[in-house]
A protein has these predicted regions:
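Peripheral, non-catalytic segments that deliver or gate enzyme domains
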Residues: 1-118, 122-128
């Protein structure tokens, strides 16, 4: 499910009533794909993740345990000094519009930093 344009993966457990718990090891940011190994016989799954700073990674997991990476695409740059954060802009009508920022860790957000801004219009229609 998406929550403020961030993927959220939950495990549903039946204990008298349905309970929703976050999937252990699901990343905070980025794209997440999950596929059951054998949904009728096990709690095992394959998890594919990627984000602005992390190459696509395939992991194997068992519900309730940290997934184990199996294979990753190569990294094309050193992301160790960078971080992803989410912020919200307010439109003229008061709607909160989420956006992500990739910046140096600990960057002072004082309005004086050079910025490369990219936007996507949605519905497969890019900004022009």
């Amino acid at each position: 499910m998406l929550e403020d344009v961030k993927n959220r993966v939950y495990v549903m457990k039946l204990d008298g009533n349905w309970k929703r718990e976050p999937l252990v090891g699901a990343p905070e940011f980025g794209t997440v794909n999950i596929m059951a190994v054998d949904p009728d016989e096990s709690n095992e799954f394959f998890l594919t993740t990627t984000d602005y700073l992390t190459p696509t990674t395939l992991s194997y997991g068992v519900i309730g345990q940290q997934p184990k990476p199996l294979k990753s695409l190569p990294a094309f740059f050193d992301a160790s000094g960078l971080e992803i954060s989410q912020h919200f802009a307010t439109s003229k009508d008061g709607t909160k519009v989420p956006y992500f920022m990739v910046a140096k860790k600990g960057l002072e957000l004082n309005g004086a930093n050079p910025t490369l801004l990219y936007g996507y219009g949605g519905f497969e229609i890019s900004l022009q």
